[in-house]
Regions:
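Short strand-coil-strand connectors
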Residues: 36-38
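N-terminal helical hairpins
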Residues: 1-9, 25-26, 41-123
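Hydrophobic alpha-helical membrane-insertion signals
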Residues: 28-30
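Short amphipathic beta-strand and strand-loop transition segments with alternating hydrophobic
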Residues: 15-24
Length: 123
């Protein structure tokens, strides 16, 4: 097997969870989650919006300031999404095949909302 093919196989099997702004050119943007698994990428909004100038692109978190104290709450929510995504990845690693987008987000939502009283209302 040549180097490029071997490298591609290794990269394909790397899992990653990160966050990004859907509209970084605007003044306020929605935050989205991006999860990659077995070469497939899953992305969608997490229904949180922030002023773009408060986004720390290196840390993938909101800058907390005296003027924007709700940044702590949003960062806690991002951490909760990240943990749910890692649990979801663990669930699908048993099967070795990347799930469909709908299957992936069904399990992710179940992991994220499992401590909530009600079920999620949006997909």
């Amino acid at each position: 097997m040549d180097y490029n093919r071997a490298r591609a196989n290794v990269l394909k099997n790397v899992s990653m969870v990160t966050f990004f702004l859907l509209n970084p050119e605007r003044e306020v943007s929605t935050i989205a989650i991006l999860v990659s698994f077995n070469g497939k990428k899953y992305r969608r909004s997490i229904h949180e919006s922030i002023p773009v100038n408060l986004w720390n692109n290196d840390k993938k978190r909101v800058r907390v300031s005296a003027k924007y104290q709700q940044g702590n709450i949003i960062n806690d929510t991002l951490s909760k999404w990240e943990v749910a995504a890692l649990r979801t990845l663990s669930h699908f690693k048993e099967y070795y095949n990347a799930p469909s987008k709908d299957e992936f987000f069904e399990v992710l939502d179940r992991e994220f909302y499992k401590d909530e009283v009600g079920e999620p209302t949006q997909k």
